[in-house]
């Protein structure tokens, strides 16, 4: 049923793909899942802290590919990458700030 499918799809996208809420919600809508069911499952599986942690982990793996670029360009590219993966602009900005402040 839709409930089980939504749950397993969410688990897969969160744990293996490290997708953000926006991307997951979009994919589930394309599969024909109702908005209220999507929101219910997303709220149960993903908090803002978890979302930030996943985005940070994803960014750490990606940031090495930007070596040699100037910092501003690298930050912009990383931010755009995170937003394409479904993270909000606020989380993408926070992750980029934290990653590039570490350097």
Label the predicted regions.
Residues 1-103:
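An alpha-helical, amphipathic repeat domain used for nucleic-acid recognition
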